[in-house]
Each structure stands twice: as structure tokens, then as C-alpha cells.
Amino acid sequence: VADALTRADALCAARGTRLTALRRQVLELVWTGHRPRGAYAILDDLSQAGGRAAAPLTVYRALEFLVAQGLVHRIESLNAYIGCPAPGRTHTGQFMVCEGCGNAQEIDDPQVTAALAACATEHGFRVSRQTVEIGGLCPHCQETHPDPEPVS
């Protein structure tokens, strides 16, 4: 968590953007627990931490800023956010999302990116953003859950 905050401070300073106290606190909460966090869970944690009470819109604006800066990613299928381990480096969002525990892991596979770009080009489609979410079971949940339905 400390490394993520240090990288965020440096990245925002280099870009001339402000990592306000609230944005920093939201980023810290996203990284705490190392699993995707929803906006309302973050809001609850902010309320429990004391200090000023934040409105949902304020938390969403902080999350939008963090996403725009590449400090966090939004996991669409979970409607939650996860810290980016490589902020400042251009990459696409590729995630393995566990359907058992809800954990998510970011991967950055250039072959996946290239294959999707080639497919888009073949169909005359211009890509503006790319997010891939692969649902399944993490190694821990595979031990306790039956096999998921295979994708054909």
C-alpha cells in the first residue's frame, strides 16, 4: 500500500495533478485488502475512519480521478475498483475475476492485446478502450468449489 501511494504521489506531481487528501485516502482504501472495493464500501470505511463525512458523489469523483490517472481500474462485472500495479505505463485492462471469492487479478498480456487489436482491424472497428474480464475460479476457490461450466 505504501509503495502504491508513493507511486501515486510521484505520478500526480509529474503530471501536475493534485492527489488531495480525500483522493489519497480513497486510493489507500482501494489498495487495502488487495481485492476489488465498491464505492459504497469505500464510503463506509471513510465514515468509520472518522474525519469529515464524504458524500457518495465525492467518492465517485475521487474514483473517477484515480481511474483517469491510471492509478486504479474499474472492474465492470463487479462494479468495483482495484489498484493498478503499473500506473504510468500504457497498458490495457485485462483481469481474471474469481466468481467464488470476488477477487480480481490484473494481467497484461501483449498477445491478448494484439489479438483483439487485429480482430478489431479485421472488422473495421476502431478501438477507443479495451477491458477484458475473464470469469472463473482462483486456485483457492478451486479447492472448495465445483468446477465451473466450461466455455466452449
Explain the meaning of each model-derived region.
Residues A2-G16:
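Short, Lys/Arg-enriched N-terminal segment that forms or immediately precedes the first helix
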Residues R15-T17, W31-H34, A49-G50:
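Short helix-capping/hinge SLiMs at alpha-helix to coil transitions
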Residues R24-L29:
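Pre-recognition alpha-helix immediately N-terminal to the DNA-recognition helix
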Residues V59-Q69:
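Basic amphipathic alpha-helical segments that dock to polyanions
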